[in-house]
Design a protein with these regions (language model features):
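N-terminal strand-loop element at the rim of the active site
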Residues: 7-14, 27-65, 77, 175
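Short hydrophobic "strand-cap" motifs at the C-terminus of beta-strands
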Residues: 6-8, 157, 179-182, 215-217
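Donor nucleotide-sugar binding/catalytic pocket of nucleotide-sugar-dependent glycosyltransferases
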Residues: 127-197, 206
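Nucleotide-sugar-dependent glycosyltransferase donor-binding/catalytic pocket residues
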Residues: 13, 184, 218-222, 234-237
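Nucleotide-sugar donor-binding and catalytic loop/hinge architecture
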Residues: 1, 192-212, 236-238
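An amphipathic, basic-hydrophobic alpha-helix
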Residues: 60-86, 94-95, 136-144
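Short His-centered aromatic/hydrophobic patch
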Residues: 88-93, 100-102
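Conserved donor-binding/catalytic core segment of Leloir-type glycosyltransferases
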Residues: 155, 207-223, 229-232
Length: 240
């Protein structure tokens, strides 16, 4: 198949969606598909040599307008092309397939409020979001994606995301596909996991019976590090 991917930036070293897209491109190319990438920037060295790149130039714009600029530029660039299928990730619309790696923005915004312990603060923050141009712009774009005239095939990454589509946009589970995010099995080797576990515990003077949690990431408040630490405190002293 001749497949077009649309995503503003594909720099796999940054992680997240960009890493997943690169992995998916490699797998599809290995299976013999012709991949086209419509993007503003990319790391060609991290992608198969068979990929055909299409530069999508964007003028400067405020943050809340950038997704609109890229989405519009992609649709313009795709005109006249003869791809079998076009695939968009996150903030694009009007394509054959939408595969939102970050789930729904509406759900994310609501869940973000839970990082505030005080219910009153949550209400205040939610109220001020009604005046946030970026917030309102992203909500409007999301409604265009899933409730607009062009009906795309929507792929959810989990049951939770599928439920969010039903809750926020009344999109039936029957109208969605479910494809869970899969890790490249060649990226991490598990054969020496126990050996590494022993070595690092010895280096850090951690007893083999001690319960240990490893957090790797940014924005620890949003990712839930604080509740994890509180949970560790509540564990029985001799817990396995």
């Amino acid at each position: 198949m001749d497949i077009a991917f649309c995503y503003e930036s594909v720099l796999p070293k940054r992680g997240g969606c960009e890493t997943y897209i690169a992995s998916l491109v490699r797998r599809l190319a290995l299976d013999g598909h012709q991949i086209h990438l419509y993007a503003s920037r990319w790391d060609a060295s991290a992608l198969p040599t068979s990929v055909i790149f299409h530069q999508v130039d964007l003028p400067w714009s405020p943050r809340f307008m950038r997704p609109w600029s890229f989405g519009s530029a992609c649709l313009k660039a795709l005109k006249g092309q003869d791809h079998d299928v076009s695939v968009g990730f996150d903030k694009t619309w009007g394509l054959d397939v939408l595969y939102p790696q970050g789930g729904l923005f509406a759900a994310t915004a609501e869940h973000n409020l839970l990082k505030y312990k005080n219910p009153t603060i949550r209400k205040v923050v939610k109220f001020f979001k009604t005046f946030d141009l970026s917030h309102q712009s992203f909500l409007m774009l999301e409604r265009l994606q899933y409730l607009g005239m062009k009906k795309s095939i929507v792929i959810g990454i989990s049951e939770m995301v599928r439920d969010h589509f039903q809750k926020y946009y009344q999109i039936s589970a029957n109208d969605l596909r479910l494809v869970r995010i899969a890790m490249d099995p060649n990226r991490f080797q598990e054969t020496d996991r126990l050996k590494r576990r022993i070595e690092w515990r010895q280096q850090w003077n951690i007893d083999p019976s001690d319960c240990l949690a490893l957090f790797v990431g940014m924005n620890y408040r949003l990712k839930g590090l604080e509740p994890l630490l509180h949970a560790m405190k509540l564990l029985p002293e001799k817990s396995p």
